[in-house]
Amino acid sequence: MSSEDLSAPGPSAPDSSFTGPSTKFELERETELRLEVEGTDPVRVELVSGLAEVFGTELTRNKKYTFPPGSRAAIFTWHGCTVQLWGSPDVAYVSRDTPMLLYLNTQVGLEQMRAQAEREGERGPRVLVAGPSDVGKSTLCRLLLNYAVRRGRRPTLVELDVGQGSVSVPGTVGALCVERPADVEEGFSAQAPLVYHFGSTTPGTNIKLYNKLTSRLAHVFNLRCDSNRRASVSGCLINTCGWVKGSGYQALIHAASAFEVDVVLVLDQERLYNDLLRDLPHFVRTLLLPKSGGASERSKECRRESRDQRVREYFYGPRGSLYPHAFEIKFSEVRVYKVGAPSIPDSCLPLGMSQEDNQLKLVPVTPGRDMAHHLLSVVPLDGGGAEEGIEERSVAGFIVITGVDTERQTLTVLSPAPRPLPKCVLLIMDIRFMDLK
């Protein structure tokens, strides 16, 4: 369950047996080829001539890149290029209407802030990206992180979108030091992410816990910046969820305060931009940016499949080259909890306890058949085995309950590491995963 267990496999050689119709696209300067792969067959792309990039990662000429079903990508060129495509994507067209120049100008501004921080011994920009669902927040974060790394920086990606899980699996928040551009096919290398258990794909299920974990991430990031000058100068990009009203909006304000952000980038929603402009401190630079025309709304089914794919990649690797372990553990060998007790009338609460306190309570879960297929976070215990503050401790890894035998009192689990489990507490998620591989 060490950080090595979370690492992604290395790139594999292209499959020369790939077949499908072939199309050549000639892209003029400052245009992009937009792709959506929704069917059952992958699509392959090759840069034949010129220069191009995917969300800030440069493409290597004459190398084939595979985009599996569910992929959405934009191949952008600053100077013009030729791209060969194999397969039948649901969407494939060239667009001149792209916000890339605005995004590049944003990166230039952030780099100027980093250079100034370097000269004056200050900290670099801390950037929060906000906006409703499906406007390209994660893509903008990836783009700006890639550009920063290509300039020699080492920014930190902070993932607060519990429904997506770009740092780890869905149902978590986390942070990742980005040291190299994202792989076109696999994303950022998650060698040693810092991950915390939330347990659900929507912050509203336990907003008290969500805000507490946000504060915890900010505290740990501050400690790292205090001890690592390069990390401090490089700053961070904070990706947020698409819930921007009511408690979701207050969670945005809380995140901005906890991380002491300097810059807020709002995608596509003028009302949110004006609200943040009004409610954030005057020194915070709040910018309204357009979303890309390639950003389209995803259905609930598409989101669910995307979450399943993230969990599958955790256990099997992006290319299916990892081999998780299946083994049994006895009921008596594990302690399983859920963070947050069910709401009860205030009159029934213990004296001095509030509903908010109830949201952070560890509730024991008795192993049973209803645990089947649930994802669980593995939280290591210290030498004394104390369970205080478990909800604020970082996660070592994840397991899935694939079977429950109540007669033999055993659980069958899927784990990235072999038995035995470390001395730990298991925190159950609302998220289920059917291991059909």
UniProtKB/Swiss-Prot annotation:
Name of the molecule in the record: Polyribonucleotide 5'-hydroxyl-kinase Clp1
Transmembrane feature ranges: none
Entry's localization field: Nucleus
EC number of this enzyme: 2.7.1.78
Chain sites annotated for binding ATP: 32, 72, 134-139
GO molecular function: ATP binding; ATP-dependent polydeoxyribonucleotide 5'-hydroxyl-kinase activity; ATP-dependent polyribonucleotide 5'-hydroxyl-kinase activity
HAMAP family (UniProt xref): Clp1
Gene expressing this chain: clp1
Job description of the protein: Polynucleotide kinase that can phosphorylate the 5'-hydroxyl groups of double-stranded RNA (dsRNA), single-stranded RNA (ssRNA), double stranded DNA (dsDNA) and double-stranded DNA:RNA hybrids. dsRNA is phosphorylated more efficiently than dsDNA, and the RNA component of a DNA:RNA hybrid is phosphorylated more efficiently than the DNA component. Plays a role in both tRNA splicing and mRNA 3'-end formation.
Source species: Xenopus tropicalis
